């Protein structure tokens, strides 16, 4: 963000501990084949926080280099100011308009549940993936998020886990100026399982416990209200000023020192961190390989369903699709 002289550092800093936990311990994906159909999906509804997503994709080994990170917010780069699907490897949906990404996540979870219902068989759990989504106060204020949340609760999308970045700050300042509702109570009324983590900045154990409980939920989607500090570690942490403007040089220097980095170095990833994330990516690749073997065995027993899944993977229209199009009579000649 500082290098680009533009961007939003606050939310990425507040959500970094949760992001690390999700990618290192929770989500299953294969960066070498980012379109694997049974991968977990991640949606960043508060798309302005995309530096966090780009960093995680880079660490995991997606097609996003350090030079791409340096080109953040530059014309034609792979790291635009908001995530763009079919442009940046690993980005599931284009987000930016607040709340829209959350609705996209509900749609993804619906598709996952549909695939599981249509194709899973005894001994062949082909589709067991989940959708994870980050959203902030701005997303929570949008009608599109409310409508989608109501639908998700109605459908009982147990495979949907949302993390609400509850930092009480928007670009306008403290949320008390315009947004004082009890979000958790609202989601409970939508038939969501609602959990709270009081220290999302440092309490990884509480975050982990909440994720485990969310995964164990069998009837409802889950909202985890994660109380974070926007710009955690900055001299301006907790303030609206850290939401959408680069940190000053002295702030960046003290931040690096505080977290054990050389304040003189830029765009550096320690070797042990790279090794750790490679192991997380390798774990996902191994699960993908296991899935492919299961899928081949599935094909021997359920050939029709196997062919249908492959058609969908290839993104081909079903034979005779045009016959299902509606026809209209001419009212004039």
Specify the residue positions occupied by each region the protein language model found:
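Conserved small/polar residues in nucleotide/adenosyl-binding loops
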Residues: 332-333
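Polyanionic/metal-chelating signatures
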Residues: 18, 255, 280-284, 295, ...
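Short, mixed-charge aromatic SLiMs
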Residues: 37-50, 74-83, 127-135
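Acidic-glycine-rich active-site phosphate/pyrophosphate-binding loop
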Residues: 21, 25-29, 66-87
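Short coil/turn segments at secondary-structure boundaries
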Residues: 9-13, 33-35, 67-72, 84-88, ...
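Glycine-rich ThDP/TPP pyrophosphate-binding loop and its adjacent helix/strand module
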Residues: 31, 87-88, 94-279
């Amino acid at each position: 963000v500082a290098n680009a002289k533009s961007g939003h550092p606050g939310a990425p800093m507040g959500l970094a501990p949760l992001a690390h936990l999700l990618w290192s311990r929770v989500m299953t994906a294969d960066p070498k084949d980012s379109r694997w159909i049974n991968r977990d999906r991640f949606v960043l509804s508060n798309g302005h926080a995309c530096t966090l997503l780009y960093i995680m994709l880079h660490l995991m080994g997606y097609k996003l280099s350090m030079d791409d990170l340096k080109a953040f917010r530059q014309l034609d780069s792979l790291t635009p100011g908001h995530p763009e699907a079919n442009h940046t490897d690993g980005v599931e949906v284009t987000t930016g308009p607040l709340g829209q990404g959350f609705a996209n996540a509900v749609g993804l979870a619906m598709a996952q549940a549909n695939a599981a219902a249509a194709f899973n068989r005894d001994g062949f759990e082909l589709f067991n993936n989940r959708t994870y989504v980050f959203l902030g106060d701005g997303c929570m204020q949008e009608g599109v998020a409310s409508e989608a949340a109501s639908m998700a609760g109605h459908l009982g999308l147990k495979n949907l886990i949302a993390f609400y970045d509850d930092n009480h700050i928007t670009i306008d300042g403290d949320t008390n100026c315009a947004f004082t509702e009890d979000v958790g109570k609202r989601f409970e009324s939508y038939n969501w399982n609602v959990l709270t983590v009081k220290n999302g900045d440092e309490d990884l154990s509480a975050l982990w416990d909440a994720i485990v409980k969310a995964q164990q939920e069998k009837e409802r989607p889950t909202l985890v209200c994660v109380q974070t500090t926007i710009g955690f570690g900055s001299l301006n942490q907790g303030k609206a000023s850290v939401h959408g403007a680069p940190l000053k040089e002295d702030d960046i220097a003290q931040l690096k020192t505080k977290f054990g980095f050389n304040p003189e170095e830029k765009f550096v990833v320690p070797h042990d961190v790279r090794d750790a994330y490679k192991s997380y990516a390798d774990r996902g690749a191994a699960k993908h390989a296991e899935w492919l073997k299961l899928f081949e065995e599935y094909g021997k027993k359920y050939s029709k369903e196997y062919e249908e899944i492959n058609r969908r993977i290839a993104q081909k229209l079903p034979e005779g699709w045009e016959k299902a199009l509606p026809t209209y009579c001419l009212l004039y000649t």
